[in-house]
Amino acid sequence: MKKLIILLFASVLSLSSINAKAKSITLGWAAWDPANALQELTKEFTAETGIDVNFEFVPWPNFADRMLNELNNKGKTFDLLIGDSQWIGAGAVYGHYVKLNEFFDKEGISMNDFSPATVYAYSTWPKGSENYYALPAMGDALAWAYRKDWFDRPELRSEFKAKHGYDLGVPANWNQLYDMCTFFQGREIDGQKRYGAAINTERGSEGITMGVTAAMYAWGMEYENPNKPYDMEGYFNSPQAVEAVEFYRKLYEDCAPPGHSDAYMVANLDAYKSGQVAFQMNWYAFWPGVSKEDSDGRVSGFFANPKQNVAAATLGGQ
């Protein structure tokens, strides 16, 4: 059976042509909460088609190696693959992914049914073209969680307002975020030393990029001249972009917990759940689990990436 792969997502759905008589198919993705939700959703698919869905979920640290090896070796483990959006270009150029326009037309799949940002980032190659190599499986974005129970303490609210002149709460911009992080840095609460924020610093994969671009986008950085593709000089290294990178570094140096120099999703979650930090940056996909696990007096609040010069956030993988 010939494979027809669709990339899908910061995660990208890779689809294979599936024999209508197939009794089961296998889907591969990363091991995390959204995969568990997808497992529930596929029950409807099985009830409607009679086709069982098997799953192989790979831990995030091993995910890219496992999936890319599968593609490079033309493996037959998966019928569907939810991979990373960063793979679309190489997948299209080196023949791992098939242009799906005719398939979409035949099956009545309209890209107008998807968020334009996810179509641009997760489906097209070259970006912005009408050449579709994937369907967006999950358009995740970067946001923040904070210890609302600490923020609601009258003594902390009074102290913060006396020092900064505004209320302790959801930060309106990155300057306020920094004020709040430094306010909690090294502070003792309930007999334990606390810190400001768990932010992305991991350098082995996309971690640091996903973190620092959250600031760069908020400062108004653009990757390239919007009227001239791949003309990056003066855009990606604009004064706003440089200021954002310097600010992110300052936030790390002044507000991160000890040893948080190579951290990404799991490390940020652990720092937050263990009570080390007042804030964590992470993906929206994790917030239901964080809220569900609130205990021992912990009350979590959530907010979108703060604006600085503009309101913007990092789209997963982008």
Residues covered by each model-derived region:
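Bacterial N-terminal signal peptides
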Residues: L7-S16
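Extracytoplasmic/periplasmic substrate-recognition and gating elements
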Residues: K21-K23, A47-E48, E130, W150, ...
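Extracytoplasmic "Venus flytrap"/periplasmic binding protein-like
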Residues: K23, E40-A117, A121, P154-E155, ...
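Extracytoplasmic "Venus flytrap"
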Residues: I25-E40, V58-P61, D140
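Hinge/lid segment of periplasmic solute-binding proteins
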Residues: S85-A145, G207-G211, F302-G317
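A ligand-binding cleft/hinge motif common to bilobed small-molecule-binding domains
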Residues: I88-A92, Y284-F303
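Extracytoplasmic/periplasmic solute-binding protein
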Residues: S123-M138, L142, N173-E233, V277
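Glycine-centered hinge/linker elements that transmit conformational signals in sensory
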Residues: Q176-Q185, A214, W219-D262, Q308-A311, ...
